[in-house]
Each structure stands twice: as structure tokens, then as C-alpha cells.
Amino acid sequence: MAAEPNSTPDGPLWVVIAAYNEERRLGETLKRLSPYCGNIVVVDDGSHDRTSEVALAHPVWVLRHVVNRGQGAALQTGIDFALRQGAGVIVTFDADGQHCPEEIAQLVEPIRAGRADVVLGSRFLGRAVGMPLSRRVVLRLGVLFTRVFSSVRVTDAHNGFRALSRRAALCIRITQDRMAHASEILDQIRLHRLRYCEVPVTVRYTEETLAKGQSSWNALKIVGQLLLGRLIR
């Protein structure tokens, strides 16, 4: 049994997973993750497959959206649930197995030590195994967009592996239902003057995860969603 990262005085560690049609990969992800955290909530975002059934076969909480609302909405549902359970630190973790649960301890350490409110995993400080050049270019453009519009200096703007203190989780409200939520979180870090840092993490790409990931066209749509959000704010 792996050692679970220490909780903060504010409460225990929780992991939130947003899952949509992940019956093939979710089981292995939960099997690898469980030794590193005893409090896991999976939010099935209106899947059409057996995602909920797979999750229920593991010692985790399972919530379900009746319709697919997008990853941002699913994460907010999970974060709200974890906060109600008394979470002191919340880690968001992808359902597809791209992230390494062994790295949770280093992700939460700056929060546990009182040095940060938000810790962002960076594949560009760590390793991006199997990442194609096209994906690297799109992600670098995302970093540039973030620096221009949010004034938050990061090396990896769209990594779903992050940790939030209880204070940060209570401050940040995800209103972008879909993938634009990652940039929105960075914007709210600046808005609420939250302390943040990055730590190196590993992201592993496979043909399957690349096929389900964000295309260049989707990246442009994310930019459009964020710009629209700024105009109507």
C-alpha cells in the first residue's frame, strides 16, 4: 500500500475525476490511483457507456450528470461534493490514465507546506511521453494566450493534473462547462490573488488518448469561448 500524502489542517485529500465514455480506461486508472488516495469521487458526465458501472466496482464515490455538460461542469460538481465532505486539498485527475498517481504527493506538497493555494502540474517542466509536435504547438499557443489575457505566467496552461487548497476551491467557480475551464481557472487565480506554483509531472500519450483529446480546431473554439466570456462578464 502506497503512502497517502499528508492532509492539511483544513481536512483530508480528495481526488476528483471527470469521466465521459471512459469504460475502457477508467477501471485501470482507479486501480492505479486508489493506493494513493482513499477519497475519490468520479463524476460520470452523461456517458452512454458503462462508465458508472466501472466506477462503482471500485471503492469510490460516483456522481452522474443526466446529460453531458462538459469537463468543466463535471469538475465543479466533483469539487463541490468534495468540499461538502470536508476536503482540505482537492486534486483533479484525468480519467484516461495519462497522469501518474505516484506524483500526487509532490503535487500537494506546496499546499501542505503552506507555500501555495494552487499547484499546477506541468508536462513541460516534467515529461510528455509520446506527445506529437502538433499537440506541443497547440499547447504552447495556449500558454501564450494565457499570458496575454490572464497575466498568469505558467509553462503549461491546459494540464488537468492540479491541486487546490480548500480556500482556493471555495474561491474558484468554474462557469465554462467545457474545455475552456482550464484557462478560466488560471484567470480566477489572478482575480482572487491566489498563490500558485508549478511542479514537474508526467503526461503519457497513447493513440487512444490522442484520438479523444483536443484537436487544433477545438483549441480555437476554446479561445472563442473565453473571449465571449470576457465580453459578457
Identify the role of each PLM range.
Residues D44-S52, G97:
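A conserved acidic beta->alpha catalytic loop
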Residues R24-E28, D49-A57:
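Acidic helix N-cap motif at the loop->helix transition within catalytic regions
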Residues W61-R84, P101-M179, Y205-L228:
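Acceptor/aglycone-binding surface of glycosyltransferases and processive sugar-polymer synthases
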Residues W14-A18, V41, R64:
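Short hydrophobic beta-strand elements that form part
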Residues T29-N39:
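Short, acidic, metal-binding catalytic loop of nucleotide-sugar glycosyltransferases
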Residues M1-K31:
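N-proximal low-complexity "stem/linker" segments adjacent to membrane-targeting elements
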Residues R153, I174-D177, L186-R204:
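Catalytic donor-sugar/metal-binding loop of nucleotide-sugar-dependent glycosyltransferases
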Residues A87-Q98:
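Short beta-strand-to-loop acidic/aromatic patch adjacent to the donor-nucleotide binding site
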